[in-house]
């Protein structure tokens, strides 16, 4: 959190020392000095960043430092739910592209407002219909940006993911990725607007927006078949490991510095071959490993033990 401005876990309460009213983290490095202070007041947690004695409630993008997290749940993403895959892809792109991050936040706010309006449906109200159409236009604008950027990101980086996978697997393979847009991408905005119009009655009944990026998914193919159907457990985890190594490469390119790598009990999910390949890949980076197995300790590492 002190480096990137937010916790990977999402909840500030998870970052607090148990039963403590205040938690302070103090870091010093070639990036300067920074502290983050969390105060629990009447059940609400307040966050404050102190960077070289300058205080702020948020960490601006220019003060964020690149961090890449490897965690077990991401290695199981292929067999997980579409919503988990969407969150993974959105987070990956947003950490690299400030415009996408802003569009994603605006899209989620617009989706929430549109759903609230659907739930407050008023029969024969022209004002209500006009309001909904206005939200339709705004929703479609952000939805188009999100869907097209997701698809473009996967298309551009598919060859790199394939190469990384082959390096990890030690063999050539047929790997491809397809973004499952709910309407054609080439005229996404107009097609989505038409789709919403046709779904109006259904959406009024359910109170939810039935189409858009929040209902879309991407599929990974291995040997021209969905990986979820034909890939072994080890192959699935190798594919997701390739995604994370892609993030490591892209973060390095964007930030012009080597990211800090966090390995959260990941080695327990890998066999000996993939563990060795991962260690070789990250050996020139600074990394922090959490593990319950002493075999994963590397020479020259500082070790902090907890019981």
What are these regions (language model features)?
Residues 1-2, 246:
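DNA major-groove recognition helices of helix-turn-helix
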Residues 2-84, 93-96, 100, 158, ...:
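Nucleotide-state sensing region of NTPase/ATPase domains
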Residues 20, 72, 180-182, 292:
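Residues that form or immediately flank small-molecule/cofactor binding pockets and catalytic motifs
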Residues 33-35, 78-79, 186-187, 296-299:
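Switch/connector loops and helix/strand junctions flanking conserved nucleotide-binding motifs
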Residues 264-266:
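Walker B catalytic acidic pair
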Residues 58-64, 71-137, 141:
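A conserved P-loop NTPase coupling/switch region
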Residues 32, 39-43, 273-307:
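C-terminal lobe/lid and adjacent interdomain/linker elements of RecA-like ASCE P-loop ATPase modules
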Residues 127-260, 269, 273, 277-280, ...:
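Conserved NTPase motor "head" modules and their coupling/switch loops across ABC/AAA+ ATPases, GTPases
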């Amino acid at each position: 959190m002190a480096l990137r401005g937010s916790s990977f876990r999402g909840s500030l309460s998870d970052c607090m020392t148990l039963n403590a009213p205040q938690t302070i983290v103090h870091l010093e490095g070639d990036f300067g000095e920074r502290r983050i202070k969390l105060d629990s007041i009447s059940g609400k947690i307040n966050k404050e960043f102190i960077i070289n004695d300058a205080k702020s409630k948020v960490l601006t993008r220019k003060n964020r430092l690149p961090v890449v997290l490897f965690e077990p749940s991401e290695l199981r993403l292929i067999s997980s739910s579409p919503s988990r895959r969407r969150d993974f892809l959105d987070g990956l792109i947003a950490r690299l592209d400030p415009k996408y991050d802003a569009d994603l936040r605006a899209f989620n706010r617009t989706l929430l407002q549109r759903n609230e309006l659907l739930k407050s449906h008023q029969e024969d109200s022209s004002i209500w219909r006009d309001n909904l159409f206005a939200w339709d236009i705004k929703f479609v604008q952000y939805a188009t940006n999100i869907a097209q950027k997701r698809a473009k990101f996967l298309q551009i980086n598919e060859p790199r993911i394939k190469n990384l996978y082959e390096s990890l697997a030690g063999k050539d393979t047929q790997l491809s990725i397809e973004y499952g847009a709910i309407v054609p991408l080439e005229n996404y905005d107009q097609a989505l607007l038409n789709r919403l119009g046709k779904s109006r009655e259904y959406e009024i009944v359910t109170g939810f927006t039935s189409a858009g990026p929040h209902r879309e998914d991407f599929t990974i193919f291995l040997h021209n078949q969905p990986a979820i159907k034909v890939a072994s457990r080890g192959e699935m985890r190798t594919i997701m490991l390739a995604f994370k190594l892609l993030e490591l490469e892209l973060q390095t390119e964007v930030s012009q510095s080597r990211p800090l790598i966090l390995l959260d009990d990941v080695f327990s999910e890998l066999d000996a071959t993939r563990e060795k390949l991962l260690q070789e890949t990250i050996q020139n980076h600074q990394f922090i490993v959490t593990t319950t197995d002493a075999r994963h300790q590397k020479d020259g590492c500082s070790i902090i033990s907890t019981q």
